[in-house]
């Protein structure tokens, strides 16, 4: 791990913790059981799939916990008052980009085979989260 990647990881973690806090402060009054199950499943699926994607890597355990931060943010987004199909689903897609990135480090052996899919899911997820946040501000006025 280089100093640059460690600093990037800290910035990543801080930004997602901050976003998770914002979502947690804006929880929907009532969520259905299915929404709760979806929110609970995202962190579990993220960690398990990351662990599997990193097989053969020397940092499997530590790095498989990395998406737990973004997945926790996604779970709070799913449960929040922000539009579910923009912010919640967008955050879940964003988490998928983290898992795809880790797959490139692990089972894909830095092949870059899923590079475009990784970046596309990152951009689409981020855009959906941003659009959900923007529409929430418009709806609240």
Question: What is the role of each PLM region?
Answer:
Residues 1-141:
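Polytopic alpha-helical membrane-helix bundles and their juxtamembrane interface segments
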């Amino acid at each position: 791990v280089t100093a640059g990647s460690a600093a990037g990881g800290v910035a990543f973690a801080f930004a997602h913790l901050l976003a998770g806090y914002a979502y947690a402060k804006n929880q929907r009054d009532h969520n259905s059981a299915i929404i709760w199950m979806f929110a609970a499943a995202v962190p579990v699926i993220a960690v398990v799939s990351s662990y599997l994607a990193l097989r053969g890597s020397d940092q499997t355990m530590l790095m498989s916990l990395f998406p737990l931060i973004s997945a926790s943010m996604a779970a709070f987004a799913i449960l929040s008052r922000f539009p579910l199909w923009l912010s919640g689903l967008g955050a879940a897609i964003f988490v998928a980009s983290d898992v795809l990135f880790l797959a490139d480090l692990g089972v894909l052996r830095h092949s870059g085979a899923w590079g475009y899919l990784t970046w596309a899911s990152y951009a689409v997820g981020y855009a959906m989260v941003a659009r959900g946040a923007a529409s929430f501000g418009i709806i609240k006025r």
